[in-house]
């Protein structure tokens, strides 16, 4: 009883680990109470065994468990429960304490996942997808509104109900018959006008007599002038000039 109270507790030092390894090589890993007495470590047999099995054994594996080892731990625990030493025998290089620590960590993570129904990653992805969808919809609406305001027609437009502005524009484009005839007259004037301009330019070089207006008054004046000329001619021949001509030029068949 006094001997147990004099045993040392707490963390192992490097000198204690070296001393324990040497005595285990001498006497094997079975007689832990004897090793604890003869080594002078002032440790219990149980403490020496746990130190050897969990930390100093040369066949121990270091590092994280592989996925195959984790799956085997879950299967064996479902079969045997919390019998960690028995489970450790099926996993060479893994200690019962290491297997127990892995199991507790696994159950703690599983409980945290149940308390948190929606993970931040999934919620962030959902928010991102919804924001992208909203941005795409707003962009399409803005582009459609800009095409309507600018009057452009998109390749994807399939017709449909026309706006009031387009119908009013078509009504404004309808012409009446008077407008059509007015446009024709205006076109005719524009066509004839260049010809008139050509002759006006040539008139600077050539002078033409003024033509009489083909009215009825001018026609009557010309008729009266013709009558006056006839009267002059008749009076002219009434003189002795014509007989004088006959006196000088007698016919060959006249006698004398």
Swiss-Prot record:
| One GO term of the biological process aspect | regulation of DNA-templated transcription
Q: Where is this motif: Bipartite nuclear localization signal 1?
A: 61-64
Keywords assigned by UniProt, alphabetized: DNA-binding, Nucleus, Repeat, Transcription, Transcription regulation
Q: Which Gene3D superfamilies match?
A: Homeodomain-like
Per the record, DNA-binding region residues lie at 32-56, 84-107
Provide GO CC annotations from the record.
cytosol; nucleus
The listed location of motif Bipartite nuclear localization signal 2 is: 108-116
Q: Which SUPFAM superfamilies match?
A: Homeodomain-like
Which region ranges are annotated with the description Disordered?
108-169
From start to end residue, where is composition biased (Low complexity)? 119-143
This entry's comment on induction and repression of expression is: By salicylic acid (SA).
- InterPro entries documented for this protein: EOBI/EOBII-like_plant (IPR044676), Homeodomain-like_sf (IPR009057), Myb_dom (IPR017930), SANT/Myb (IPR001005)
Domain of life here?
Eukaryota
Q: What does this protein do?
A: Transcription factor.
The record's listing under PANTHER family reads:
MYB TRANSCRIPTION FACTOR-RELATED-RELATED, TRANSCRIPTION FACTOR MYB48
- Protein name from the UniProt record: Transcription factor MYB48
């Amino acid at each position: 009883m006094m001997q147990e109270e004099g045993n040392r507790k707490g963390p192992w030092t490097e000198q204690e680990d070296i001393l324990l390894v040497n005595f285990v090589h001498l006497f094997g890993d079975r007689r832990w109470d004897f090793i604890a007495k003869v080594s002078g470590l002032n440790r219990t047999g149980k403490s020496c065994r746990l130190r050897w099995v969990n930390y100093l054994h040369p066949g121990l594996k270091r590092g994280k468990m592989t996925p195959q080892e984790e799956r085997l731990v879950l299967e064996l625990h479902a079969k045997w429960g919390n019998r960690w030493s028995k489970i450790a025998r099926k996993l060479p290089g893994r200690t019962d304490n290491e297997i127990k620590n892995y199991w507790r960590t696994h159950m703690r993570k599983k409980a945290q996942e149940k308390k948190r129904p929606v993970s931040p990653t999934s919620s962030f992805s959902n928010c991102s997808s919804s924001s992208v969808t909203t941005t795409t919809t707003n962009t399409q609406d803005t582009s459609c509104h800009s095409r309507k305001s600018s009057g452009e027609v998109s390749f994807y437009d399939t017709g449909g109900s026309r706006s009031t502005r387009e119908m009013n524009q078509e009504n404004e484009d309808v012409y009446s018959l008077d407008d059509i005839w007015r446009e024709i007259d205006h076109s005719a004037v524009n066509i004839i006008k260049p010809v008139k301009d050509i002759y006006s330019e040539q008139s600077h070089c050539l002078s033409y007599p003024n033509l009489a207006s083909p009215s009825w008054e001018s026609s009557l004046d010309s008729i009266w002038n013709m009558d006056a000329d006839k009267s002059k001619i008749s009076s002219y021949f009434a003189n002795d000039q014509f007989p004088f001509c006959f006196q000088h030029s007698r016919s060959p068949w006249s006698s004398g």
